[in-house]
Amino acid sequence: MAGQGKPQIQFKLVLVGDGGTGKTTFMKRHLTGEFEKEYVATLGVEVHTLVFHTNRGPIKFNVWDTAGQEKFGGLRDGYYIQAQCAIIMFDVTSRVTYKNVPSWHKDLVRVCENIPIVLCGNKVDIKDMKVKAKPILFHRKKNLQYYDISAKSNYNFEKPFFWLARKLIGDPNLEFVAMPALAPPEVVMDPALAAQYEHDLEVAQTTALPDEEDDL
């Protein structure tokens, strides 16, 4: 009974990016989050409650998903207000979704200012990548964390949440003590492909940033 009454640690996380980048698919991988989602009609968003079990106790991310309304223009400020962290997603098979990352970032920091942000390149299970590791520079210029992910194969699903949890709690020793229950993978991530991407990212991190003042 000692733990009763102890408030659960929770954070509002906003998930942004162009339509079709796989944001909703990504959220639906987490089974309890899909079961417990709520629809906020006034803002036209779905809020998925994702719980991760850590050595510091359970951490809950209330993930706000746009429910596709970004296709009709920018999101209203109410979507971003009081967000404590964010994930910006693009599709590695679509250059335009990466080119739009700076505008999503700009909207985020205009309302939320200094919150931890993870940039995710989704669909790395598809071999026909249009956005390779070397040109992905935006996160380095803006001091964001970056992960390759594949929502359909569950590849690196927990990584963005793990990094954000450590940042938000302020504990570099925080660990997940159990993996979340995820939907079975729809595709299998080729281990050799994953290893190649990880190697490419490591090499890209050591490459000097270009001098020009280009957003990307």
UniProtKB/Swiss-Prot annotation:
A single Gene Ontology CC term: cytoplasm
Protein name (record): GTP-binding nuclear protein Ran, testis-specific isoform
Entry-annotated residues carrying N-acetylalanine: 2
Localization per Swiss-Prot or TrEMBL: Nucleus
Gene3D superfamilies: P-loop containing nucleotide triphosphate hydrolases
Residues where GTP binds: 17-24, 65-69, 122-125
Positions of post-translational N6-acetyllysine modification: 60, 71, 99, 134, 159
Organism lineage: Eukaryota, Metazoa, Chordata, Craniata, Vertebrata
Main location as per UniProt: nucleus
